[in-house]
Amino acid sequence: MLPSQSPAIFTVSRLNQTVRLLLEHEMGQVWISGEISNFTQPASGHWYFTLKDDTAQVRCAMFRNSNRRVTFRPQHGQQVLVRANITLYEPRGDYQIIVESMQPAGEGLLQLKYEQLKAKLQAEGLFDLQYKKSLPSPAHCVGVITSKTGAALHDILHVLKRRDPSLPVIIYPTAVQGDDAPGQIVRAIELANQRNECDVLIVGRGGGSLEDLWSFNDERVARAIFASRIPIVSAVGHETDVTIADFVADLRAPTPSAAAEVVSRNQQELLRQVQSTHQRLEMAMDYYLANRTRRFTQIHHRLQQQHPQLRLARQQTMLERLQKRMSFALESQLKRAGQQQQRLTRQLVQQNPQSRIHRAQTRIQQLEYRLAETLRAQLSATRERFGNAVTHLEAVSPLSTLARGYSVTSAADGAVLKQVKQVKVGETLTTRLGDGVVISEVSAVTKTRKSRKKTSNP
């Protein structure tokens, strides 16, 4: 006889479905470690096996789309770490797990720790771009934190010597593998910051397995990189190796050699820049001289077209002022060119390309000498043209004619007298001599002719 309030009654199908939904929704995705047994792979390509430990076991399935990403062939008795979803196979009521990924137990546990630390540091903001420091350009001193016997150090030094042989390098030797490595790497970073000898650091090592590179997945190393005041370039392993240090560093280089490329400057490129600057300086000086020559020609042309001495004096004053301005401008230009040459010389001395620097300095000295000679020649020619113009103007001036003993007589109305018929007896005349003026009154007018003379008395 059933009770008055009947409990819920499940069919077998509904029961299995309810249990499956509870397992999938409540448990979600989990990580499981265990030993493989009863491994089979039918023609479908799916994997079926059992995971067990000392006291229990569970059935597992890994479908073809997932197992083709596994890089090894599972073996009976092998310890593995799997990421899986818990479910229930409803037709038989079998509880099982659906595996999404599989790794050997050693690397798998490390990978799990890696993912957990990555998520933790990312949540704290250690990977944020706002905290990334810019690398110096150019670097004046590079620090290298790596093993002093490893291939990574050899690769870094080889690239730096090839690209920028005068760049100072300070090595902070440290272990990069083993239990003591994280602590040594942290101390090396702190030491580099205390000494403050370098303006960029390369932290890294050569390639290896996940266990070999694990020192650079250590939380202490990550936090030391983040706390460094000096920008850090991480260079761990090969391009496919990505560590926690890569995420925290200010820049990740795929290899140690690539890191050396990033922090160094190409000496050949610097020489090309110097040559380009020198060429632009020559062009600027040529343009400046042509412009000033054109200006002198215009001034000389205007002086030739203007006669009065007052205007001539003003033009002379203007010319002198322009000459002073030009001299000042040229001196300033030469001074700036000299300062630029000194800066370029210092840079070249730092890079130690002595022979090219010597040739560049010799060329600049030749240009300076040619420039000075050209300016002196043009100034001398301008002064000579100016003197000739003054002499010509003085030669045709009426005042010069008077100075030679001639005189000019004008009537009372100012008209210059050319014939005696313009003069009347008793009229007042003005005669201009070389050194003054004579005022006279006409008492008689005589006109000279070949046959006779005419005389009139007042």
Swiss-Prot record:
Places the protein is found: Cytoplasm
GO CC, sorted alphabetically, is: cytoplasm; exodeoxyribonuclease VII complex
Instruction: Specify whether Hydrolase is a keyword of the entry.
Output: yes
Question: What InterPro entries does the database record attribute to this sequence?
Answer: Exonuc_VII_L, Exonuc_VII_lsu_C, OB-fold_nuc-bd_dom
One GO BP annotation is:
DNA catabolic process
So what does this one do?
Bidirectionally degrades single-stranded DNA into large acid-insoluble oligonucleotides, which are then degraded further into small acid-soluble oligonucleotides.
Q: Which HAMAP family match?
A: Exonuc_7_L
Query: What family does this belong to?
Result: Belongs to the XseA family.
Protein name per Swiss-Prot or TrEMBL:
Exodeoxyribonuclease 7 large subunit
Q: Which organism is it from?
A: Escherichia coli O1:K1 / APEC
